[in-house]
Every structure is written in structure tokens, then in C-alpha cells.
Amino acid sequence: MKLTDYVKQVSLEDFGRPFIHHVQWNRRLRSTGGRFFPKDGHLDFNPKVYQELGLDVFRKIVRHELCHYHLYFQGKGYQHKDRDFKELLKAVDGLRFVPSLPNSNSKPIKLYRCQSCQQRYQRKRRIDTQRYRCGLCRGKLLLVNQPED
């Protein structure tokens, strides 16, 4: 898929306005589907969203970024908080938030339990049980589950 041609097509079909700036993939985007840069008008998109969630979700993200784009160049409110943005986003059926991506490098949760009061602690990082104690009763902590690394 040629990204620039696709964004131009979505802009004409859904907004009735041409897109005349630059579009590019940005692999460094983590928690967002795309970004609009008002300074020069270009758009960045997260390729993982397209690969993992498919074309339907990606089209809605393109619509979201094009809402920012077209409203900015019309001199209207283009930020998420602005009424113009919210109304246009709803009219073109764009996504407000990106659905979460399957994260392959997320850390497994470690579960610790106090031996005295049975208080549970969930942590992504290891706790030194020789050094740290329960925050409620000062009892010893015990690692309950050891996730596979």
C-alpha cells in the first residue's frame, strides 16, 4: 500500500478536500496511531497499527489525523479539546483512541504475598525479599508465582 496515495484518497472521499503535504511511517510511535505536525503539515503513522489491527482500524486513524490537518488549515479548533474537532471526528467516524496493540515485550507480572497478613503485591520488577517487608504488618514477603522468562 502506498501510504501517501491512500491518505490522499481518504481525504478526498471522507472530507471532500485534498491532502497536499507529506505522509510517512514512523516506527518509533508506541502508544499512538499517528501524529499531525502543524509546523509543516506532515503526518506520521504507526505501521504496527496497520499490520496488527488491519485496514479498517487504520482508516479510522487516518481520519482522526486528517481531522487535525483540515481543521488546522481552516483556522478552526484542531486540538482534541476543541468542539470543532470532536464534531468533525464524529461526522467522519474516526477513532478517538487507538485500540491497544498486542505488546510482545511486556513484562510478566510477579505476585508476592505477605506470610503474616496475606496482603498481595503485584509487580513487574523483582522485589528483594531479604531487604523489603510488607507495608502493612512488616511481615516477610514470599514470591507466589514465578513467571517463565
From Swiss-Prot:
Which positions bind Zn(2+)? H64, H68
Q: Which InterPro entries match?
A: SprT-like_domain (IPR006640), SprT_Zn_ribbon (IPR035240), Uncharacterised_SprT-like (IPR023524)
One GO molecular function term of this record is: zinc ion binding
The protein's superkingdom reads Bacteria
The UniProt entry, under SMART domains, shows: SprT (SM00731)
Q: Does the keyword section mention Metal-binding?
A: yes
Which residues belong to any copy of the SprT-like domain? Answer: 4-144
Q: How is the cofactor bound?
A: Binds 1 zinc ion.
Q: What pairs make up the disulfide bonds?
A: none
Q: Which Pfam families match?
A: SprT-like, Zn_ribbon_SprT
User: What positions does UniProt annotate as the active site of this protein?
Assistant: E65
Write out the annotated subcellular location: Cytoplasm
Offer one example of a GO biological process linked to this entry: response to stress
Write out the GO cellular component annotations. Answer: cytoplasm
**UniProt similarity note:** Belongs to the SprT family.
Kindly provide the name given to this protein in its UniProt entry: Protein SprT-like
- What organism does the record attribute this protein to? Streptococcus pneumoniae serotype 4 (strain ATCC BAA-334 / TIGR4)
